Amino acid sequence: MTKSKVYFGSIQQGQAHGFASLGAKLDTLLEHLDFSSIEKNDKVAVKMHLGFHDGYQTVPVFFVRRIVNAVKAAGGWPFVTDNPTAVYNAAERGYTQETCGCP
């Protein structure tokens, strides 16, 4: 079994530049990932925790949209998913097709 690459990006911004923002750091990470296994129109699950009831420990839509855009740029057809219960009330937390860029 080969070792997986682990990427680390500090949440410390330290600079007042756009390239130091968390969104820019995620974009840099996505540029280093290998999306070559995605073929045109492949369905690609973006598996995440969408929250439950009053929980708020979820990934902001701002970041999800960047991941979705990277999958689309590779030719894939992304969709956000979680367990069935969480999917039903995902819109209440802001996870919609319009905000995420995919179903």
PLM regions and their residue ranges:
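N-terminal and secondary-structure boundary signal
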Residues: 1-103
